[in-house]
Amino acid sequence: MDKENFTRLRGELFCDHPLARYTSWRVGGKAERFYRPADLFDLQDFLTQLPSDEPLTWLGLGSNVLIRDGGIKGTVILTLNRLKELSVVNSQLVFREKSGTEDFFSGNGKTIIRAEAGVTCAKLAKFCVSQGLEDGAFFAGIPGTVGGALAMNAGAFGGETWRTVIGVETMNHQGEILKRTPDEFKIHYRQVEGLENQFFIAGYFCFNHGDPDKAKTAINALLKKRNLSQPIGKYSCGSVFRNPPGDYAARLIESAGLKGKSIGNAEVSEKHANFILNKGNASAADIEALIHYVAQHVSQIHGIQLVKEVNIIGRS
């Protein structure tokens, strides 16, 4: 299935397309098909023309995913810098209709921002700062896009994505857009249930008004803290494991003596033990083997089973 099988497309469609450069680990095989939509409406056109049983995988910044060396079956859709609309919206608007009645959500005097899935969390944080919204600064510590943050309830510096969400837009396999509210989902620590073969394409975030200078100071302080504690600029996915209740994955890994542990060219970071680095030419298999080794070793030493935060996908 190539571009000749489609009409009206304005995006870019590739077959057998290498995926490593689209992930922050810089590893992984090829996608059978890879689509980079021009915008949200082009994505709708594309999806309406796909077979109903076509497997779909969505990528943003590729920062919380390990793509295996055998690649991905079906179609990979890249949202980064394609679903990129970011704006302040009316503080009270019609969000959806139910049984002929209009449901409203309101910011109660706060600021509501609509951000599409391909907007990076760093860009969302900077936009919040420009609007004087200090409580949105934590997004600067999330190394991904809005779509990924919504899908996993990403968080940083004590903030969590879904604490700020008052509504979302999702898209199904047929390209239909649905508007949904948080009460339709089960929100957990680094996990969201209730998507059911749909994909997040935009979020509505509600923030308190504040002083732009204070917001800028807050984001700078958070970024300084991150740069001191994390291996910024290295090939990693961010945190590999979720923090267990009452503890930290990094502390458990470090106390198990695993800092600097390597398999192939994958290595547990010396700076932050919950980061695994690609030292230059690691394979996805190297990284996955090290993830399993760390989890097994921590379980043996501490009796705690670490749960992966990173999503491992594709064929071995």
Curated annotation (Swiss-Prot):
Q: What is its EC number?
A: 1.3.1.98
InterPro entries reported in the protein's UniProt record: FAD-bd_PCMH, FAD-bd_PCMH-like_sf, FAD-bd_PCMH_sub1, FAD-bd_PCMH_sub2, MurB, MurB_C, MurB_C_sf, Oxid_FAD_bind_N
Q: Name one GO cellular component term.
A: cytosol
Task: Kindly identify the residues recorded as the active site.
Answer: R190, S239, E309
Subcellular location as annotated: Cytoplasm
Keyword annotations for this protein, in alphabetical order, are: Cell cycle, Cell division, Cell shape, Cell wall biogenesis/degradation, Cytoplasm, FAD, Flavoprotein, NADP, Oxidoreductase, Peptidoglycan synthesis
Q: Give the protein's function.
A: Cell wall formation.
HAMAP family, per database record: MurB
- Name of the molecule in the record: UDP-N-acetylenolpyruvoylglucosamine reductase
